[in-house]
Design a protein with these regions (language model features):
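Short glycine-rich or small-residue beta-strand-to-loop segments that form or flank ligand, phosphate
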Residues: 13, 20, 115-119
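Short, polar loop/linker segments at the starts of domains and inter-domain junctions
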Residues: 19-27
């Protein structure tokens, strides 16, 4: 245990701007921030997810692929790049067919994404299963997430059962978990 090292996942470029600025940081503004990140030593930087791809296109008239590629080229592998996905819904609000998931994940990995953190708000295994399989199969790292709340009607076994289901389906293996 003496060799253990603290690894930090930074969410600023995804959740920080999403929560504070309605995901409206332009590419020019992101570019000004990247030199500070380059040598920060973050294990993972979560740079996409939620509303990022939609907002970048809809409100800023920019390409989310250019954003991802620019961040990747600046970081030069110093930090893994991550996105938060709603599983079968990707970054939208409706489920997409497998061929859309596959094409999207191929493009994301090609443009520099390393890790896809995947969740379903209702912990429905069927909504995350295909995404996890695709990301792993395309050479990315699937990072399965479980949603939980602190409430008397939700006991800890509810959440551990969900995790066990993901393991049972072969979606998560201990050797694939991110430390």
């Amino acid at each position: 245990m003496a060799n253990r090292k603290l690894k930090i996942r930074d969410l600023t470029l995804r959740d920080g701007q999403q929560s504070l600025f309605a995901t409206r940081l332009s590419q020019a503004e992101i570019d000004k921030l990247l030199p500070y990140y380059e040598n920060a030593g973050f294990y993972i930087m979560e740079v996409w997810g939620g509303a990022v791809p939609d907002s970048v296109m809809r409100y800023l008239d920019e390409s989310p692929w250019t954003r991802l590629r620019t961040i990747s080229e600046t970081m030069k592998g110093k930090s893994l790049l991550s996105a938060l996905s709603r599983g079968r819904n990707l970054f939208g609000y409706k489920p997409y067919p497998d061929f859309v998931l596959k094409g999207f994940y191929e493009e994301a990995i090609k443009n520099g994404l390393n890790v896809m953190r995947i969740f379903d708000a209702l912990n429905d295994i069927d909504n995350v299963k295909e995404s996890i399989k695709l990301i792993n199969g395309l050479g990315g790292i699937a990072d399965g997430a479980v949603c939980y709340t602190v409430d008397p009607k939700y006991v800890p076994t509810t959440h551990t059962e969900t995790i066990e289901k993901k393991s049972f389906f072969g979606l998560i293996k201990k050797t694939e978990t991110i430390e």
